């Protein structure tokens, strides 16, 4: 495959080209994907020998290059550093549909790297990378049961759209990524605006039709350039050893698995395993380490098979629940006195403490990646410490799993967040997982709903989440509601569904089998809705509506609208005016280009004071209005009176009184308060005032009255001489 070959088709109205044979020729397989003006190179490499361990060492990397959008990376080094959250989430998105399609017992290391070379904003580099990953694998000599493909699906005015453009995505009420093989769906990731289960299922199946077409396209590429698959040594237990271990442990393992409480069950299972392992250690075998590793693997498979048999055949779950039963629920709000809002949610032995923090809009997150620059005023972060599962270990920066679970919670809650106009705050949620026995990401969604209600955030509706599971033996399958850790680990599906009482707001599905049929997806969504409504009922029994007042420790934000041309007056030369207001009141001030002013502090009195100062600065006098101000300057021709901060007017000497005034000082002195009426605002914005207009006029003999000509009182000003 030394010569470049190009394969083309149409994808969502754009040209899709796959180029092989020119780039990255030393990789096991490589493909350059051109989708519109988006260009992504994906290379896959598989090791020749299996790696020690009892897991499949697959690594998927998605590398964003800032040059792909004509940008120079920020920071001192001016080069790409650690992956962005978006890159991390994309790597997970690609990993999830690919991983189930490697054979059981595959232990050779496989690494897939997608590098983004060029980005067309309307042609998703993520979907190009997913397609490239599949192509690189299927044309390589690495055994892989693909191809797979993925597509984005939107819905605009009831019509489904493949790979929506940025403009279309803004109008869509569904943001769905679905992946799978020609025969079945095996990965779903979605956010939505309270859509029905039926609409979501139709979106998934609509996407699958396009996936089928892309898989057929890849078959053409395989036929033309695909390599012969190499022979791989799969990890398989010794049949005699397996039978021996099974005979010694199966009865005890069955009893241990039926222990309902998690820690007690884990202890009982561990006791069975230790007993069997000790019996083999006592034999002092030559290849002891290898045998013990194999025995440990066999014991885990016995544990897995027995749990699956109990659920599938006996309809008994390890903790004794029915297949559609939710674990006991409890929740609490307001347990942290100094934070802005807090919610503790417990479901069985899974517990999440979520905290809501409110901040001025200036605290938003700026995201400057491969897309257009974004401003996020709503964030959800998820933390999973080792103590939550009773283990020790170092605390590191958030990993892929924590970033992924945080993003899922954010997506689930995004739709119910009030608009900036309705609630002008930056909102940050942090979910601390304190206990975990499955479904911790969904517990964080429930805890976050409680925390926002406790903080007084006027969300559109409460949101709850539930994780569904599946055990499939042949054609028989059992769908599980609210899965725990063991069911997640040994089951075939982790299907997370979040939403309000009116519809779905987020969806995430991962499976360990080849794919799922429409029937299973339909039943899982229906069963998930029942569980979600049950949890929502519990949440609203704890707190049914947002608190009417924000925490005393939360910033209070007042919004003021001024004319855009007045912004410069509020800011002042070099920021002098706005800094003086901040120094005087201690508030934070943000001004938008449209003239919207946000004033924030914990002290509402200071907010009001700052508002009053700004209103005075931007206030415009109107003819006929009456003001009480202080005399700031006296001249021979009249007195200058400060009507309000930043605005003076002139009371001409002839407007001080009805009778003739010889000297201004006979009527007014510096610092006097005087009530005046605006009689004119000239074309230059100068304000002429009258004191006598508010005084009762003394009666004058008819013959003494003389007509008065209209007067302009401001003295003429000379133009400054040019230097």
UniProtKB/Swiss-Prot annotation:
Residue ranges, compositional bias (Basic and acidic residues): 693-723
Keyword rRNA-binding recorded: no
The protein's enzyme class: transferase
Domain (KH): residue spans on this chain: 555-614
PROSITE patterns the UniProt entry points to: KH_TYPE_1 (PS50084), S1 (PS50126)
Location(s), subcellular: Cytoplasm
Main location: cytoplasm
S1 motif domain segment(s): 624-692
InterPro entries (UniProt xref): ExoRNase_PH_dom1, ExoRNase_PH_dom2, ExoRNase_PH_dom2_sf, KH_dom, KH_dom_type_1, KH_dom_type_1_sf, NA-bd_OB-fold, PNPase
Catalytic reaction annotation: RNA(n+1) + phosphate = RNA(n) + a ribonucleoside 5'-diphosphate
GO cellular component, one term: cytosol
UniProt-listed SUPFAM superfamilies: Eukaryotic type KH-domain (KH-domain type I), Nucleic acid-binding proteins, Polynucleotide phosphorylase/guanosine pentaphosphate synthase (PNPase/GPSI), domain 3, Ribonuclease PH domain 2-like, Ribosomal protein S5 domain 2-like
Gene Ontology biological-process annotations: mRNA catabolic process; RNA processing
One of the Pfam families matching this protein, by short name: KH_1
UniProt: Mg(2+) binding residues: 488, 494
EC identifiers of the protein: 2.7.7.8
Gene Ontology molecular-function annotations: 3'-5'-RNA exonuclease activity; magnesium ion binding; polyribonucleotide nucleotidyltransferase activity; RNA binding
Cofactor(s) this protein requires: Mg(2+)
Family classification: Belongs to the polyribonucleotide nucleotidyltransferase family.
Function noted in UniProt: Involved in mRNA degradation. Catalyzes the phosphorolysis of single-stranded polyribonucleotides processively in the 3'- to 5'-direction.
Protein name, as recorded: Polyribonucleotide nucleotidyltransferase
Organism listed in the record: Listeria monocytogenes serotype 4a (strain HCC23)
Organism ancestry: Bacteria, Bacillati, Bacillota, Bacilli, Bacillales
Gene that produces this protein: pnp
């Amino acid at each position: 495959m030394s010569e470049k070959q190009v394969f083309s088709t149409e994808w969502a109205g754009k040209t899709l080209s796959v180029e092989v044979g020119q780039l990255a020729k030393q990789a096991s397989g490589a493909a350059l994907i051109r989708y519109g003006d988006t260009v992504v190179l994906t290379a896959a490499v598989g090791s020749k020998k299996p790696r020690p361990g009892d897991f499949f060492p697959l690594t998927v990397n998605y590398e964003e290059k800032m040059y792909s959008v004509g940008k120079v990376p920020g920071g001192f080094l001016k080069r790409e550093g650690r992956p962005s959250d978006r890159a991390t989430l994309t790597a997970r998105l690609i990993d999830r549909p690919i991983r189930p399609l490697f054979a059981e017992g595959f232990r050779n290391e496989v690494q897939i790297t997608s590098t983004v070379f060029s980005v067309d904003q309307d042609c998703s580099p993520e979907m190009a990378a997913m397609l490239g990953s599949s192509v690189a694998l299927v044309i390589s000599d690495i055994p892989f049961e693909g191809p797979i493909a993925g597509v984005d699906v939107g819905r605009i005015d009831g019509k489904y759209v493949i790979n929506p453009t940025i403009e279309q995505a803004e109008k869509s009420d569904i943001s769905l990524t679905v992946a799978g093989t020609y025969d079945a769906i095996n990965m779903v990731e979605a956010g939505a605006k309270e859509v029905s289960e039926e609409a979501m299922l139709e979106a998934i199946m609509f996407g699958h039709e396009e996936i089928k077409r892309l898989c057929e396209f890849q078959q053409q590429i395989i036929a033309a350039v695909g390599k012969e698959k190499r022979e791989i040594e799969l990890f398989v237990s010794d049949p005699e050893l397996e039978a021996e271990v099974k005979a010694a442990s199966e009865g005890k393992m069955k009893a241990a698995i039926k222990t309902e409480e998690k820690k007690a069950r884990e202890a009982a299972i561990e006791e069975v395993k230790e007993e069997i392992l000790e019996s083999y250690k006592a034999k002092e075998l030559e290849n002891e380490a290898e045998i013990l590793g194999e025995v440990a693997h066999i014991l885990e498979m016995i544990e897995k098979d027995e749990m699956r048999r109990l659920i599938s055949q006996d309809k008994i779950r390890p903790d004794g629940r029915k297949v559609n039963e939710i674990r006991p629920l409890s929740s609490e709000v307001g347990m942290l006195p100094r934070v802005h809002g807090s919610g503790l949610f417990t479901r069985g032995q899974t517990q999440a403490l979520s905290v809501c923090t409110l901040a001025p809009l200036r605290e938003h997150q700026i995201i400057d990646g491969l897309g257009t620059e974004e401003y996020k005023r709503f964030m959800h972060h998820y933390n999973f410490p080792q103590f939550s599962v009773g283990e020790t270990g170092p605390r590191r920066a958030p990993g892929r799993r924590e970033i992924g679970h945080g993003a899922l919670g954010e997506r689930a809650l995004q739709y119910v967040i009030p608009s900036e106009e309705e609630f002008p705050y930056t909102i940050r949620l942090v979910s601390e997982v304190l206990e975990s026995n499955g479904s911790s990401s969904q517990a964080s969604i429930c805890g976050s709903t409680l925390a926002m209600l406790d903080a007084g955030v006027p969300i559109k509706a409460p949101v709850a989440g539930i994780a569904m599971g599946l055990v499939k033996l042949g054609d028989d399958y059992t769908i599980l509601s609210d899965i725990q850790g063991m069911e997640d680990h040994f089951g075939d599906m982790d299907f997370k569904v979040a939403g309000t009482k009116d519809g779905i707001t987020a969806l995430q599905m991962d499976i360990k089998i080849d794919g799922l049929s429409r029937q299973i997806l339909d039943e899982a969504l229906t069963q998930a809705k029942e569980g979600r409504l049950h949890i929502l009922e519990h949440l609203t029994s704890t707190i049914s509506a947002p608190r009417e007042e924000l925490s005393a420790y939360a910033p209070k934000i007042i919004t003021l609208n001024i004319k855009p041309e007045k912004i410069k007056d509020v800011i002042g030369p070099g920021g002098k005016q706005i800094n003086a207001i901040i120094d005087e009141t201690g508030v934070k001030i943000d001004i938008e280009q449209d003239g919207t002013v946000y004033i924030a502090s914990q002290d509402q009195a200071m907010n009001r004071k700052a508002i009053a100062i700004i209103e005075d600065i931007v206030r415009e006098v109107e003819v006929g209005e009456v003001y009480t101000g202080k005399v700031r300057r006296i001249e021979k021709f009249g007195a200058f009176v400060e009507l309000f901060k930043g605005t003076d007017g002139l009371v001409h000497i002839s407007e001080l009184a009805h009778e003739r005034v010889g000297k201004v000082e006979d009527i007014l002195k510096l610092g006097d308060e005087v009530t005046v009426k605006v009689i004119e605002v000239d074309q230059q914005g100068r304000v002429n005032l009258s004191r006598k207009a508010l005084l009762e006029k003394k009666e004058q003999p008819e013959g003494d009255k003389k007509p008065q000509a209209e007067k302009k009182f401001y003295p003429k000003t000379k133009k400054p001489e040019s230097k």
